[in-house]
Amino acid sequence: MSESSGSALQPGRPSRQPAVHPENLSLDSSCFSSPPVNFLQELPSYRSIARRRTTVHSRDKQSGTLLKPTDSYSSQLEDRIAENLSSHSLRNYALNISEKRRLRDIQETQMKYLSEWDQWKRYSSKSWKRFLEKAREMTTHLELWREDIRSIEGKFGTGIQSYFSFLRFLVLLNLVIFLIIFMLVLLPVLLTKYKITNSSFVLIPFKDMDKQCTVYPVSSSGLIYFYSYIIDLLSGTGFLEETSLFYGHYTIDGVKFQNFTYDLPLAYLLSTIASLALSLLWIVKRSVEGFKINLIRSEEHFQSYCNKIFAGWDFCITNRSMADLKHSSLRYELRADLEEERMRQKIAERTSEETIRIYSLRLFLNCIVLAVLGACFYAIYVATVFSQEHMKKEIDKMVFGENLFILYLPSIVITLANFITPMIFAKIIRYEDYSPGFEIRLTILRCVFMRLATICVLVFTLGSKITSCDDDTCDLCGYNQKLYPCWETQVGQEMYKLMIFDFIIILAVTLFVDFPRKLLVTYCSSCKLIQCWGQQEFAIPDNVLGIVYGQTICWIGAFFSPLLPAIATLKFIIIFYVKEWSLLYTCRPSPRPFRASNSNFFFLLVLLIGLCLAIIPLTISISRIPSSKACGPFTNFNTTWEVIPKTVSTFPSSLQSFIHGVTSEAFAVPFFMIICLIMFYFIALAGAHKRVVIQLREQLSLESRDKCYLIQKLTEAQRDMRN
């Protein structure tokens, strides 16, 4: 195209030149090489760059952002890609097949001019990457419940699939925790107990202490009724109390092998610390991945509407009814977005009197919420105190049902509180005048706090009973030895009962509530009351809160009951199949799906809250409450944590000095300041990246406006040529 044709594209200048093709307009740089042409200065992107010229100096003033000469750029891109082919696969590049073939030919041509050593390195690198890809593909086929989860995703979409993927993650997490405890604690004991290795137990040398603190009463071995075994199995007492399931079984100081002595108290404590640290790192890693996805998906409201309308369909759905459900869920999400938009507009238009009235009502309703929580916590406290006092005094005088009720009274009260309070919160929040999305988040937050705080209330109630007594026993032993001769085992029994009772409730609700409800809705369709009752919905947030509750129990109880992670693994495996059967045959997906269910970020965030709440009572138990003197591996230590300073004292003096220096305040304060500076740096870096992302989004918008502008000018030029 000549210079005159370039000027013909200016507004109001007719032209007799041939028609201009878009590919020539975008690729041929000669058409914009003449200095008098000022057409490109009219592009929206060029005007934006002119306004930001102080920050963008590398832009070409004549060619804007789109219309640069592309021949040299393409050749440089090809050379760069060809050079990097040795470290990246061709499939990673966004190129068509012909370009990939051309680049492959370039690579083969370059290989001929390399030395034999470089050729061997290239081929070995390719072979190793190909092997890793094949191994990665094979591991995906070995993934637990892969076909089941894919089937659920195909029938019910990605929302419900995320719950089952989260459940699979908890199964794997508990399995790894159990393997850590098994390798560090159980395996040395089993090898010695069954004479598998040439080793022996090192008994704990009892120090000079009051004999009253070392008394551990053994249950009577007289006539035992059959139902006593059922009670023992459900409560962890009796024959289970003396097994390796609980803390009191490990009353040894170590295991002596041929060449060394295995320090069991240290291994017992380190297994708990390692389990919690692994859980924290694993959850944070997966949370960061989900947070990255949420950052990528963060968008403006207009973009959110466009994405839901043009890209909101889930192509994994193959079932007709699920497709209808997806239609309704998209419709609900659009309604929710519009409702939130109306709510924002309503908030902006509120008068000062309405604002005062709304906030006063919210304050009053939040006081009611706090009163409900306080009543639940007090009920758990009273039930725990009543159960602990009567369990030791009158347990032999009770019949089977009364005995079981006393043992499970705290678990029953906690389950009732977890069942009733969500319904109360759902009724209260309707009057607080929040947006629909915030209503869901606030309700879930209250339910999370309720479920997890009940466990903490139970543990702290037990702790208060353990450390308080009426006589001088607490002065002698440091704890209530008369009521709790081995208090760690009894705390483990409470966690065991919570785990078993939660599992029984899940099975009972599925088999005796959901299944009969499905039968009534199916075969009694003429009854209007039953049809109004309807089929049970598969509520994702409620199910997630249930398994997070069970996992929090497992974290707290793993120190007091080392086999509890194995029980939790079996429990979650059974729950997976029960929930899958319930989803397929008794439940229907909720027509109002939780929006964060498309990613596991929210689930992992709730799980992280549960882990933090579990660490608090464990830290207090390990560092503050005196260890039992009648059972367990820490009978010669005032607290469990004292095994760490004792072990450090056996190290060489130089290593001791280093450890004491690292753990001192002189090191901790500067280290904390450096960490804060690094954190501030990354926060500033994230802010800069965010600003760059905003600029790039603006630039993308300007690129599209450039295209529209060019098409408009091209159309005008073609119209002028026809005229």
From Swiss-Prot:
TM segments?
169-189, 220-240, 264-284, 363-383, 405-425, 495-515, 556-576, 602-622, 666-686
Q: Which GO terms describe its molecular function?
A: ion channel inhibitor activity; mechanosensitive monoatomic ion channel activity
Q: Which keywords, in A-to-Z order, does the entry hold? A: Glycoprotein, Membrane, Phosphoprotein, Transmembrane, Transmembrane helix
For this record, the Gene Ontology CC terms, alphabetical, are: neuronal cell body; plasma membrane
Q: What Pfam families has UniProt attached to this entry? A: TMC (PF07810)
Q: Where is this region: Disordered?
A: 1-28, 51-71
Chain ranges on the Cytoplasmic side, renumbered to this chain: 190-219, 285-362, 426-494, 577-601, 687-723
Judging by the UniProt lineage, the source's domain of life is: Eukaryota
Quick check: keyword Glycoprotein in the entry? yes
Q: List the disulfide bonds.
A: none
Q: Which residues lie on this side of the membrane: Extracellular?
A: 1-168, 241-263, 384-404, 516-555, 623-665
- Indicate how the chain sits in the lipid bilayer: Multi-pass membrane protein
Q: Which GO terms describe its biological process?
A: sensory perception of mechanical stimulus
Subunit text: Interacts with PIEZO2; the interaction inhibits PIEZO2-conducted mechanically activated currents.
Q: Which family does it belong to?
A: Belongs to the TMC family.
> How is this protein named in the record?
Transmembrane channel-like protein 7
Source organism of the structure: Homo sapiens (Human)
| Protein's gene | TMC7
